[in-house]
Amino acid sequence: MHAFPHGTTATPTAIAVPPSLRLPVIEAAFPRQLHPYWPKLQETTRTWLLEKRLMPADKVEEYADGLCYTDLMAGYYLGAPDEVLQAIADYSAWFFVWDDRHDRDIVHGRAGAWRRLRGLLHTALDSPGDHLHHEDTLVAGFADSVRRLYAFLPATWNARFARHFHTVIEAYDREFHNRTRGIVPGVEEYLELRRLTFAHWIWTDLLEPSSGCELPDAVRKHPAYRRAALLSQEFAAWYNDLCSLPKEIAGDEVHNLGISLITHHSLTLEEAIGEVRRRVEECITEFLAVERDALRFADELADGTVRGKELSGAVRANVGNMRNWFSSVYWFHHESGRYMVDSWDDRSTPPYVNNEAAGEK
């Protein structure tokens, strides 16, 4: 079992995966790859987090590399131009910081602070250039990352990305509502909400600037392409739930597939873990089947025209990266400090976040 170290070379090192979380098929059939830009990516994103003041300097120094945010993206968007991958990695790092702010706002009951942030993010998404110097560094960092993402493809792609992220913001608001009221959503409601809070279609949209081609709706919505994209994201979300379950139970959270199964289907913890794992394994099996259909679709697009060749190449590259997402997500969960709950002083409080409880920031 190999994973990449936190240094500047891509020499694999052994990582022990707990038996309950180990997926031999991922280790055997989904070889891990890493974008060659990764060492520079890690360094530049670390600098960006400091410059944008998204994390305190001492926490960046101590935790940023070990959180492995850049490793996750560098293992996904293979073939992306360096500039595109850098913009995606910075946006992804911002997303994790936003997720942590959202969590702390819930923990400390900062409803007003969350409401203000929610409104500002909606506004900044539509006009990032007007928010680059906002007093809330989270808003300014978001504006910077979105402005850069908007530079790669036509305005129609930007509008779709914005539309998808507006729904993500609203899904985070629904999660805020549920968690502050102790509401555990039913399984189907949770699965629908999880597709939004995990930003399934955002990460799928970002495959397009990575391959340098905006896909027309007829291609993007083709059943094989769309199903492959969904399965890769479902795997990531549900494997995240499997790995996060101890942390989220310790933190009295309510948003986890395992917690919904325990609450609404009367499963024991052991049974819930087994059911989440079963769903994770089904995603892998079904992806391996639909991947063939998606690649066959890519071949069909190559109709002898220049445009057909471009679309065929883009779909093939994107489906290859959907495959990469499985291995990148898998190893991320066993390398990143986000999931090393047993090493924290307080299992309910990540050491890499600002846990300021006073006031509404």
Swiss-Prot record:
Pathway participation: Sesquiterpene biosynthesis; epi-isozizaene biosynthesis
Residues noted as binding Mg(2+) 1 in the record, renumbered to the chain: D99, D103
Keyword Lyase (UniProt): yes
Residues that bind Mg(2+) 2: D99, D103
Binding site for Mg(2+) 3: N240, S244, E248
Cross-referenced Pfam families: Terpene_syn_C_2
Entry's free-text remark on domains: The Asp-Asp-Xaa-Xaa-Asp/Glu (DDXXD/E) motif is important for the catalytic activity, presumably through binding to Mg(2+).
Name of the molecule in the record: Epi-isozizaene synthase
Organism expressing this protein natively: Streptomyces coelicolor (strain ATCC BAA-471 / A3(2) / M145)
